[in-house]
Amino acid sequence: MEDLKEDIKFIVDETLDFGGLSPSDSHEEEDITVLVSPEKPLRRGLAHRSNPNEVAPALQGVRFSLGPLSPEKLEEILDEANRLAAQLEECALKDRERAGTGPGRPSPRGKPSPRRETFVLKDSPVRDLLPTVSSWSTPPPSSLAGLRSSDKKGSARAVRVASGKKPSSIKKESPTCNLFPASKSPGRSPLAQPILPPRRKTGFGARTTASPPIPVRPVPQSSASNSQCSSRLQGAAVKSSSRLPVPSAIPKPATRVPLIGRSLPPGKGALAPDSLSTQKGHPSAIGHRASVSQKTNLPTTSAARGRTTSAARGRAQPLRKAAVPGPTR
């Protein structure tokens, strides 16, 4: 230790001589050394300088010196401060670790607690232990299945009732629909149906008979207009039969039959005018009477047919407006 103390030298004064020719600094130092000499007492107002390189005298007994600390003491204080700082750092680290590894908090390196994990309680037995608050608002699946089955049964019954009521409605409308034969399958388009000759009905409850040929043959225009009218009425009837039947919109044949048969009796509609003249017993005037009857019957039959066509068109127009044809399947 003594060798180390001898090697260490402290710089007490640092003299900076900027002017080499001016000995002002040296004179001041000489004066200071003279003042510090132990022979003379210290003057007040002057700085007291101590030489750190001097060895402190041995302590005689218990004696406290209030002077500056020796370098040995300074080194010991520095070592002690370093040790204390290291201990404080270690204690702070330990406190942090203890605070992090508490009973309620999980350790950062360990497995997390199961409280933070989420579980699906759909099929677990713990579901029965949970409170059933929403059980009255949402019915159980068994009741839902029962409701669905009851709904299915009710819909099946409604379909059966509707299917059972359909034939009765068709039968009710059959007296008016028998005038024009409707298609068996209502899904077919009315254009694809073949045009059949119309039927005539003498009474409301009588059976249907095939319509006889037109009595007046030499007039082709009236027959063409009658066929067009019958085809239009038949198409309208097919459209109405394919959809829900409208009893008020279908024209009844009772008004058309007496108009056509005004000149001829209903029982003798199929007989020609020649046969009528022969039954009366005038063989000499057959041709004349036939021509007269033809001439007389022409305007009546044509007027009657014109009336029937106009009436049928007037009645068929609201039917076309009421029953809108759907898209062809």
Curated annotation (Swiss-Prot):
Chain segments annotated as coiled-coil in the UniProt record: 70-94
UniProt modified residues of type Phosphoserine: S22, S65, S70, S124, S185, S189
Residue spans of biased composition, Low complexity class: 222-231, 300-316
Region: 5 X 4 AA repeats of P-X-X-P, residue numbers: 38-215
PTM annotation: Phosphorylated during mitosis.
GO BP annotations, alphabetical order: cell division; microtubule bundle formation; mitotic metaphase chromosome alignment; negative regulation of cell growth; positive regulation of DNA-templated transcription; positive regulation of microtubule polymerization; regulation of mitotic spindle organization
Tissue: Highly expressed in heart, brain and lung. Weaker expression in kidney and testis.
Sequence repeats: 38-41, 68-71, 103-106, 194-197, 212-215
Region annotation (Disordered) ranges: 93-329
Biased composition, class Basic and acidic residues, residue ranges: 114-126
Pfam families reported for this sequence: GTSE1_N (PF15259)
Keywords of this entry: Cell cycle, Cell division, Coiled coil, Cytoplasm, Cytoskeleton, Mitosis, Phosphoprotein, Repeat
GO molecular function: microtubule binding
Major place of residence: cytoplasm
Induction summary: Induced by adriamycin and mitomycin C, in a p53-dependent manner, in NIH3T3 cells. This induction is inhibited by actinomycin D. Also induced by cisplatin in a p73-dependent manner in embryonic cells.
Location within or outside the cell: Cytoplasm; Cytoplasm, Cytoskeleton, Spindle; Cytoplasm, Cytoskeleton, Spindle pole
GO cellular component, one term: spindle microtubule
Transmembrane segments annotated in the record for this chain: none
Family listed: Belongs to the PSRC1 family.
Described function: Required for normal progression through mitosis. Required for normal congress of chromosomes at the metaphase plate, and for normal rate of chromosomal segregation during anaphase. Plays a role in the regulation of mitotic spindle dynamics. Increases the rate of turnover of microtubules on metaphase spindles, and contributes to the generation of normal tension across sister kinetochores. Recruits KIF2A and ANKRD53 to the mitotic spindle and spindle poles. May participate in p53/TP53-regulated growth suppression.
PANTHER family according to UniProt: DIFFERENTIAL DISPLAY AND ACTIVATED BY P53 DDA3 /G2 S PHASE EXPRESSED 1, PROLINE_SERINE-RICH COILED-COIL PROTEIN 1
Assembly notes: Interacts with APC2. Interacts with KIF2A. Interacts with ANKRD53; recruits ANKRD53 to the spindle during mitosis.
Name recorded for this polypeptide: Proline/serine-rich coiled-coil protein 1
Species of provenance: Mus musculus
